[in-house]
């Protein structure tokens, strides 16, 4: 018996992989949002802004590659978000933070 499939209708299988790398400006946006929300949280005394800053900072650090890292780019968002959270919860006027 011969093969009933037609040779012209056979499609070869190929594997599609989704790109998991962050886009071009995504890392800079996480860093920028972390700094902006950190300043807003410290100046306006909003704890929610400080927590958003901390989440953006963690997202920035988790997607950071070794070739993009320098001390200044890592230290700015981390120090600002941590300083704001420490001031909000352990500062002398911590009961004023709403």
Curated annotation (Swiss-Prot):
Keyword Transport annotated: no
Coiled coil: none
Keyword RNA-binding: no
Membrane topology classification: Multi-pass membrane protein
GO terms, biological process: protein insertion into ER membrane
TM helices/strands, residue ranges: 32-52, 78-98
Compartment annotation: Membrane
Gene Ontology molecular function: protein folding chaperone
Keyword terms of this UniProt record: Membrane, Transmembrane, Transmembrane helix
Record GO cellular component, one term: endoplasmic reticulum membrane
Family: Belongs to the Asterix family.
Name of this protein: Protein Asterix
Protein species of origin: Dictyostelium discoideum
């Amino acid at each position: 018996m011969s093969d009933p499939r037609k040779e012209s209708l056979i499609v070869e299988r190929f594997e599609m992989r989704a790109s998991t790398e962050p886009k071009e400006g995504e890392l800079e946006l996480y860093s920028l949002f972390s700094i902006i929300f950190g300043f807003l949280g410290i100046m306006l005394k909003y704890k929610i802004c400080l927590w958003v800053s901390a989440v953006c900072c963690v997202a920035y650090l988790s997607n950071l590659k070794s070739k993009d890292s320098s001390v200044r780019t890592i230290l700015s968002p981390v120090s600002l978000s941590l300083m704001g959270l420490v001031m909000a919860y352990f500062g002398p006027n911590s009961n004023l933070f709403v």
